């Protein structure tokens, strides 16, 4: 069970419709350190571990830029610059770049550690503790990567260039980029990384355009109202019927009929699409 102190600890969270990701400020997902880390689809964790190792060690965080749609993690690996750009589509899309900014050649071993356990959110919340930490699943080989499957769910993790272990010799100013995609089958990434990233970053501005806006002569109040509009979008999931507000983030990111009705009624003047959903 996650304590109140852990709930307000510094984690980075991204959400897009029914997917949300929780990680440390270096982008790593370590459920042994924070029980709720991982990629979630509704009330099921479809990826529990996601770590980057450079020459056998985890890089140290030196910078972070994150908004509602994407996050950029800046890391240092003994003088090598590591950048992780992450957003959500049908799962996680991530671009990992290792750059040699030194004046000498560097031998680099880039290794990606991944894992899945399909834990239930009820376990993370403490309602059913035995569901919080199921045994990890051994991956099987799949086209372009690996596959984890249990109880009707299957997660596929792919890498381009293929493989989760890469050895490179980088000269001064050279870099190496690896794309890692995590998707819940049968969905798979539908676009190249950059166009998909632009589309992800457009989700919240488009939502704001569809909502009623209020402007005042107080800049701080305007910023508060804009953030509140974005927060409502983050709460919402997409279903065949339309947008549906969930109860709360992160561990109540599931539909509750009463909560959704109350939220939709209050937001009728802002965006009636929620009530239709």
Tell me what each language-model feature is.
Residues 1-229, 233, 239-243, 254, ...:
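Terminal accessory carbohydrate-recognition/targeting modules of carbohydrate-active enzymes
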